[in-house]
Amino acid sequence: MQFSTTPTLEGQVIVEYCGVVTGEAILGANIFRDFFAGIRDIVGGRSGAYEKELRKAREIAFRELGDQAASLGADAVVGIDIDYETVGKDGSMLMVSVSGTAVKTRR
């Protein structure tokens, strides 16, 4: 499965548009990691715990996107948009959502 943020794939022709596909992931952040990440951010370092959670959520969302596209018979997803948002009463969860258009292509 190919993924692209662009509306086309260089060197390939889109022969069929299969529909809009989406993938979402919501992950809760551990309170202790949040505490130590906050301390690290105060002293100017990067938060490895947050970066790991973000990467994990993005991978899950893209896996869902690809699975949905494959179920439509597509071999690529174009025009992908990636959104990040904190959710929950206290912003303790991270949501990653991806969407795009599933397509069939040929060279």
From Swiss-Prot:
Protein family: Belongs to the UPF0145 family.
Protein's organism: Cronobacter sakazakii (strain ATCC BAA-894) (Enterobacter sakazakii)
Pfam family, any one: YbjQ_1
UniProt superkingdom: Bacteria
Name of this chain's protein: UPF0145 protein ESA_02470
